[in-house]
Amino acid sequence: MKLKGRKIVGGKAEGELIVSQKPLSFLGGVDPNTGIVTDAESDIRGQSIAGKVLAFPRGKGSTVGSYVIYALKKNGKAPKAIIVGEAETIVATGAIIAGIPMVDGIDVSKLKSGQRVRVKADEGLVEVEE
């Protein structure tokens, strides 16, 4: 399955998906030292985003969330790529400063955790292995 979106941050990544169907706050919602989702309201609470392709509808919360994304990258606990339904400033800024490929305009309800994907962010393309 190929899904077409829009490039936010260029680059390529391939890996296992971790998908949340709920908005995600990085400040207080993801531990920057471990990559574990800690948000009590998250449907992926307790799971690690480190080294995976992270998909969720949109970000929420404080602007400091951008720096949490950057800290994840510096600590080697960042996702390989980010896929969102709607890019908002907090997550987009974090992906930009961390250099994490990011695509928006993707219907994340079509994605499932555990699937393997290729993100070709320069083309705004997400390819899901079937």
From Swiss-Prot:
SUPFAM superfamilies, per database record: LeuD/IlvD-like
Reaction catalysed by this enzyme: (R)-5-phosphomevalonate = (2E)-3-methyl-5-phosphooxypent-2-enoate + H2O
Molecular function per GO: hydro-lyase activity
Record keywords: Isoprene biosynthesis, Lyase
GO biological process: isopentenyl diphosphate biosynthetic process, mevalonate pathway
Intrachain S-S bonds: none
Enzyme nomenclature, EC number: 4.2.1.182
Lineage top rank: taxon: Archaea
Keyword Lyase on entry: yes
Pathway field: Isoprenoid biosynthesis; isopentenyl diphosphate biosynthesis via mevalonate pathway
HAMAP family, A to Z: PMDh_S
Assembly description: Heterodimer composed of a large subunit (PMDh-L) and a small subunit (PMDh-S).
Similarity annotation: Belongs to the AcnX type II small subunit family.
Protein's job: Component of a hydro-lyase that catalyzes the dehydration of mevalonate 5-phosphate (MVA5P) to form trans-anhydromevalonate 5-phosphate (tAHMP). Involved in the archaeal mevalonate (MVA) pathway, which provides fundamental precursors for isoprenoid biosynthesis, such as isopentenyl diphosphate (IPP) and dimethylallyl diphosphate (DMAPP).
UniProt cross-references to PANTHER family, sorted A to Z: DUF521 DOMAIN PROTEIN (AFU_ORTHOLOGUE AFUA_6G00490)
Protein name per the record: Phosphomevalonate dehydratase small subunit
Source species: Thermococcus onnurineus (strain NA1)
